[in-house]
């Protein structure tokens, strides 16, 4: 393709699209730029594989540190395992892109987005989402697009499109909305307890901007002389489907109407029907068209049976307004919770149950040094003081699988629950702990990420974290058949799997803190989104009320096994003194006291130990080392060593001075040992600090009141 460049004036900024310049062998490629941010996005299609029953789409987003003018750390000096942010951005691109491919498409598709230059004024993620749509169109892949995404921020009372990092940090909203010509297709947001009306207005505001980007893509396709590919779906043999419908429809409908069945019981009953069909087909002659259709591939029978089950479940919801467990459309499953379910060695724990979904969250309080360093990110010098990790073991759905490292799904769910809690965490100045919550999904039947939000709240309150408000969450679903739309509250697994939407909303009684909407259809109107958001509020508040019956306030004390933190400020110029050459001094204090010391560049020193007395001892040493001395100050100290001309006294932790023999008494002293011995407590006064920083002490001219005060202060410091 010949080189082509198009500039779009968008919200006061230019977005530049360069086609045909880079990656000429990719199916489609575009370099999308705004400011000094540049993202190369490619889309490539390969022939499909036989026997698969899903779209093999892979989306990868990567960042190169050269984009920010940096060289990677480590021995290899090369980018290694992708940081969490790039995994989340890969998901951000995938989620609005995937629903727009035809359901019948089985070709291997790969979209790769590579940030090649980074401008701190222009985040690259939403550019990558829009670029993925453009690359797909250029690659002539069947696609129900175009699709585009923008970020919406809220600074003061004003919504802004594609805010800078600084504006995101200062604002109360960070919302990404993606859409197609058919409506909104994906929303993801973190918010500072914003009311529902503000979120709905922000989505509407963002979608208007998305429409402008969609129009620009259509113009680009026309200018390139391309057409949006709409391949006809392959013909589907209805033989097997008709056979199963004739023999199993009544039984499937009967099972779906048995509302008292649990998920395992319902699955087992449906499996019996499916197995009976399989047995009947196996008894047919080998040349029978039905048997041939069922054995065309190993998944033909199972997938056809699933599609028929899906049809009847959806019709039951649309026609009867009742769900497979008998609930009304807006009804939440039974909720229960507990705190303190694990021994006190665990700093805080919460168990949350909603229907057959069960999540156990455990909270650990750490020191500032436990914060997660994000230096592998293009945004440098960042760290996280709150971490949430989500685990989804196979036994949670009754399966046996190898245990592996967290995948994209686990990382995404963990990040969403983390985002939901961030706005209610106490300020660092009030609660300097680093906080980690791990949510273990012990049983899954839908909405485990929102179960993790609820479990996290319970665990934090049990750990004594003074959160501003408790947070709860609920997942909403959707069934859309033609013009008939049904919004479902608190979806369970089968409704998520067979439905058209998964809309997770978390927040407090004051407003929304996080939401994430994913679609399986090509777009949704704002009216339906608004209905889902308002319906989610009722569910959230119902769940929150149940949680508050378990624990209504954070505990007033942390676990006895949590570290005790003491924070002091020192002159930043004294940091080197405390650390010492090669860290010798600070290591010595740690070894002597058993406390851990963290020092920040501004002179904030955090000292931690499970035993508070150890922390106090380390604090006193640091304070003594960094305390400004004045001539005439009086201290109680101990003699540490003796030399012929005087005695050395440690009068503050880590700080020594010398008493010359002439200053030991108001009479002539023949030998130092005649007056003091090593280990003796003595009252001394700072006589002089010479130009080399040496401290000269005296025992002369000390008033009895000064001596008494010094002894009292020394007792406290010990």
Swiss-Prot record:
Binding site for Mg(2+): 496, 502
Keywords: Cytoplasm, Magnesium, Metal-binding, Nucleotidyltransferase, RNA-binding, Transferase
Domain of life: Bacteria
SMART domains noted in UniProt: KH (SM00322), S1 (SM00316)
Gene Ontology biological-process entries: mRNA catabolic process; RNA processing
GO cellular component, one term: cytosol
EC class: transferase
Reaction(s) catalysed (UniProt annotation): RNA(n+1) + phosphate = RNA(n) + a ribonucleoside 5'-diphosphate
Residue ranges occupied by any KH domain in the UniProt entry: 563-622
Domain S1 motif: 632-700
GO molecular function ontology, one term from the record: polyribonucleotide nucleotidyltransferase activity
Keyword Transferase: yes
UniProt xrefs under SUPFAM superfamilies: Eukaryotic type KH-domain (KH-domain type I), Nucleic acid-binding proteins, Polynucleotide phosphorylase/guanosine pentaphosphate synthase (PNPase/GPSI), domain 3, Ribonuclease PH domain 2-like, Ribosomal protein S5 domain 2-like
InterPro entries: ExoRNase_PH_dom1, ExoRNase_PH_dom2, ExoRNase_PH_dom2_sf, KH_dom, KH_dom_type_1, KH_dom_type_1_sf, NA-bd_OB-fold, PNPase
The keyword ATP-binding is assigned to this record: no
Protein localization: Cytoplasm
Protein's job: Involved in mRNA degradation. Catalyzes the phosphorolysis of single-stranded polyribonucleotides processively in the 3'- to 5'-direction.
HAMAP family: PNPase
Family: Belongs to the polyribonucleotide nucleotidyltransferase family.
Subunit text: May form homodimers or higher order multimers. Interacts with RNase E (rne).
The name this protein goes by in its record: Polyribonucleotide nucleotidyltransferase
Species of origin: Nostoc sp. (strain PCC 7120 / SAG 25.82 / UTEX 2576)
Lineage, highest ranks first: Bacteria, Bacillati, Cyanobacteriota, Cyanophyceae, Nostocales
């Amino acid at each position: 393709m010949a080189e082509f460049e198009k500039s779009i004036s968008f919200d006061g900024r230019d977005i530049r699209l360069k086609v045909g310049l880079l990656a000429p062998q990719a199916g489609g490629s575009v370099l999308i730029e705004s400011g000094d941010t540049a993202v190369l996005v490619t889309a490539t299609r390969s022939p499909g594989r036989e026997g698969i029953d899903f779209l093999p789409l892979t989306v990868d987003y990567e960042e190169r540190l050269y984009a920010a003018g940096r060289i990677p750390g480590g021995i290899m000096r090369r980018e290694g395992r992708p940081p969490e942010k790039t995994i989340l951005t890969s998901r951000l691109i995938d989620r609005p892109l995937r629903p727009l491919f035809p359901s019948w498409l089985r070709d291997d598709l790969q979209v790769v987005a590579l940030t090649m230059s980074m401008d701190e004024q222009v985040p690259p993620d939403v550019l990558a989402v829009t670029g993925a749509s453009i690359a797909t169109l250029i690659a002539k892949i069947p696609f129900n697009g175009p699709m585009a995404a923008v970020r919406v921020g809220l600074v003061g009372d004003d919504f802004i499109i594609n805010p800078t990092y600084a504006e995101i940090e200062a604002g109360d909203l960070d919302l990404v909305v993606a859409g197609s010509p058919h409506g909104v297709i994906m929303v993801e947001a973190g918010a500072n307890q914003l009311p529902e009306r503000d979120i709905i207005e922000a989505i509407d505001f963002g979608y208007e901007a998305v429409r402008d980007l969609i129009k620009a893509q259509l113009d680009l396709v026309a200018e390139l002389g391309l057409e949006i590919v709409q391949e006809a779906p392959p013909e589907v043999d209805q033989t097997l489907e008709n056979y199963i419908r004739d023999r199993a429809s009544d039984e499937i409908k009967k099972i779906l109407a048995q509302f008292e069945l649990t998920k395992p019981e319902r699955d087992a009953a449906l499996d019996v029907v499916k197995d009976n069909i399989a047995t009947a087909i196996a008894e047919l002659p080998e040349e029978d068209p039905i048997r041939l259709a069922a054995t065309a591939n190993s998944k033909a029978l199972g997938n056809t049976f699933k599609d028929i089950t899906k049809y009847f479940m959806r019709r039951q919801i649309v026609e009867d307004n009742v769900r497979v467990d008998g609930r009304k459309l807006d009804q939440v499953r039974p909720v229960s919770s507990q705190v303190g379910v694990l021994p006190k060695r665990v700093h805080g724990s919460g168990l949350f149950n909603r229907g057959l979904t069960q999540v156990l969250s455990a909270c650990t309080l750490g020191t500032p040094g436990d914060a997660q360093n994000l230096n592998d990110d293009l945004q440098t010098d960042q760290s996280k003081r709150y971490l949430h990790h989500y685990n989804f073991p196979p036994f949670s759905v009754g399966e046996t699988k190898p245990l592996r490292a967290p995948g994209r799904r686990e990382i995404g769910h963990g990040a969403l629950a983390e985002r939901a809690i961030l706005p209610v965490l106490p300020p660092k100045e009030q609660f300097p702990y680093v906080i980690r919550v791990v949510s273990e999904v012990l049983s899954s039947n839908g909405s485990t990420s929102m179960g993790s939000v609820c479990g996290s709240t319970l665990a934090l309150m049990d750990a004594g974290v003074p959160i501003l408000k408790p947070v709860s969450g609920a997942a909403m679903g959707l069934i859309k058949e033609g013009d008939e739309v049904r919004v479902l509250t608190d979806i369970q697994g089968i409704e998520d799997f067979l439905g058209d939407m998964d809309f997770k909303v978390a927040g407090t009684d004051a407003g929304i803190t996080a939401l994430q909407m994913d679609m399986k259809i090509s777009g949704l109107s704002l009216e339906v989104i608004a209905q889902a958001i308002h319906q989610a509020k009722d569910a959230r508040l119902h769940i929150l009320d149940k949680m508050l019956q378990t624990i209504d306030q954070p505990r007033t004390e942390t676990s006895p096994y949590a570290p005790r933190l003491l924070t002091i400020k020192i002159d930043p110029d004294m940091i080197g003194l405390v650390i010492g050459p090669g860290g010798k001094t600070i290591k010595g204090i740690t070894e002597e006291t058993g406390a851990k010391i963290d020092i920040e560049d501004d002179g904030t020193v955090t000292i931690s130990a499970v035993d508070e007395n150890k922390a106090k001892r380390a604090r006193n040493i640091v304070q003594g080392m960094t305390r400004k001395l004045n001539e005439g100050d009086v201290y109680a100290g101990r003699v540490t060593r003796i030399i012929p001309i005087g005695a050395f006294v440690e009068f503050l932790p880590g700080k020594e001075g010398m008493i010359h023999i002439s200053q030991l008494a108001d009479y002539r002293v023949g030998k130092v040992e005649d007056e003091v011995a090593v280990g003796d407590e003595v009252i001394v006064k700072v006589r002089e600090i010479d130009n080399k920083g040496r401290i000269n002490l005296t025992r002369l001219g000390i008033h009895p009141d000064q001596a008494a005060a010094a002894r009292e202060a020394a007792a406290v410091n010990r």
